[in-house]
């Protein structure tokens, strides 16, 4: 019963906390986080690596300055 309770709390937190807050909660360095355009993507550091979260797809090429390669805003056609 306790396992079910903790699992439900964990799932609730996953669904309701932003990635940065979740990283701090789980203890992964709480590294620097640089939101360039919150509506379309986030660029942040996790475990010494740079990651891009672009429309719910994560890219990891190690260079936050290259965010354009995966995170260009798209127009609605």
Swiss-Prot record:
Q: In which tissues is it expressed?
A: Lowly expressed in spleen, kidney and lung.
Compartment list: Secreted
GO CC annotations? Answer: extracellular region
Q: Which UniProt keywords apply?
A: Antibiotic, Antimicrobial, Defensin, Disulfide bond, Secreted, Signal
Tell me the disulfide pairings in this chain: 43-70, 50-64, 54-71
What role does this protein play?
A: Has antimicrobial activity.
Name-wise, this protein is Defensin-B6
Q: Which organism is it from?
A: Ornithorhynchus anatinus
Species lineage, top-down? Answer: Eukaryota, Metazoa, Chordata, Craniata, Vertebrata
């Amino acid at each position: 019963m306790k396992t079910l309770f903790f699992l439900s709390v964990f799932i609730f937190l996953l669904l309701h906390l932003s990635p940065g807050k979740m990283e701090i909660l789980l203890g992964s360095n709480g590294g620097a986080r640089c939101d360039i355009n919150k509506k379309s993507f986030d660029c942040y550091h996790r475990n010494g690596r740079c990651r891009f979260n672009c429309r719910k797809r994560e890219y990891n090429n190690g260079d936050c300055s290259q965010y354009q390669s995966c995170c260009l805003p798209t127009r609605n056609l």
